[in-house]
Amino acid sequence: MAIMQGGQQILAFILVKVAADRLGDTGFGIYMFAAVMSYFVLLLNDLGLVTYITREVSKARDKTTTLFTNGFALKITLLVLSLPFLGVYLYISRSDPEKMRAVLAFGVFGLFSSLNQLCAAVYRGHERMDYEMAVTLFEKVLITTAGMWFVVRGRGVVALCMAFGGASIVSFIINLSLVRLKFLHERAQIRWSVMKRLFGSALAFGLFWIITNVHERVDVLMLERLTNDAIVGWYTLAYKLILVAGLIPVILMTATFPRISKAVHNDPDEVKRIYRLGLKYLLLIVLPMITGTLFLADHVCLFFGEDFGPSGNVLRLLIFASGVDFFSIFFSGFMMARDQQKRLLWLQCAALCLNVVANFILIPRFQHMGAAMATLISRGLIFALCTFWIARSLGRPDYRALPLGVVSTGVMAIFLWKWQGPLFFRIGLAILIYGGLLLLMGGIRPSEILIESKDDDEQKPNTGKP
């Protein structure tokens, strides 16, 4: 999984580099704005179904067919929410035909990504995330190849967005075939009563994810209205880099959520073990990530083109927001496994309101930097309260590895300060220095990195046969 995820991020990095170079800050701003709109389409077509079905399949794998079949029917029904949302924006933005077509193309990507995520819920519930990662990697290869070809050939931002939509359709065909072949071993009927129960049970998750994603992307929407596409491009380049880093806690939460859901009521020691190990390694990742970004932010942003020089300081602020998000995302998995999603929902609502108010105050004065400040303020609120709640239920974190991380980070920082070589050599050597020192001092234990199942039989897919 780690190798596949690394491959995905390399492909995404290459595409962002080519798109930023060829489209410029204005075209790149349109591209990223359309991508943000696709997230809202995806969320309105999901409403928490993926999270809920993942949890329920992990508890009772013999219900996979019923949950998937009725979940799929419910997602088709939910098109009545996502399509009008897209239509309203397209009507409002008629004055900018290029942006309108880009949003429409990414809207297709959002709809089919929602269906792909439903298939991923089955994979996760059966702890077979290798299927998800393989199909996602294939999709990224298609997107990167087609997107680069369109951009290099001068087809523009709309063609680039169409590459995303086309690749998501191909991925859906593959995912649906895999789910039917590997996990659906009986016929299931579509029942209104089951769909209604799924909708009601998943709604709290859905509202949480909608508010979370509005909170994460409202700054882009407000920048687009209060400034211009070039400033949106400066901000979203830094934000895109932060999203890449933010996949680390998402992967950890996704991988551990099914196991936490099963263990939360009958094996509290296993839950605490996952909590301690996950927190330890997130802390050891966040320390060098923030420090390295402070030194290299300008060089990283200028790598994507001279137009993106203003993105450097944005990245320096957002990396702190990303750092606290590492822990908030990881903690949210424990809270949802404990049916505390309503508490998370209220917290996200409060943070969203704070973020909107801060953006209204800061963007007119500081533009892209104001949006970054608002993001850091609201993410800090979420981190503080999530940490307080988790510490009450699972105890204080184990900080014994912290001094080793600080020492290793300090040595790495001295290296970055003194040596001004090529960017990627500096990054690679900094990682080697940090990781090597941690390993030598005993901060990293290879036996801890994989959180292994205590029951090998749990890893085997349920075939429905005795």
What are these regions (language model features)?
Residues 414-466:
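Membrane-proximal transmembrane or re-entrant/amphipathic helices at the cytosolic face
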Residues 1-50, 83, 109, 140-144, ...:
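Signature of the first transmembrane helix
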Residues 26, 90-106, 229, 276, ...:
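Interfacial segments at transmembrane-helix termini and the short loops linking adjacent helices
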Residues 1-8, 34, 43-90, 101-102, ...:
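Membrane-water interface segments that mark the loop-to-transmembrane alpha-helix transition
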Residues 130, 157-158, 173-216, 255, ...:
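Interhelical loop/hinge segments that connect adjacent transmembrane helices in multipass membrane
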Residues 56-59, 112-135, 316-350:
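Membrane-interface junctions at transmembrane-helix termini in multi-pass inner-membrane proteins
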Residues 17, 45-61, 124-125, 238, ...:
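Helix-loop junctions and terminal segments of transmembrane helices
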Residues 100, 104-107, 134-181, 197, ...:
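Hydrophobic alpha-helical transmembrane segments
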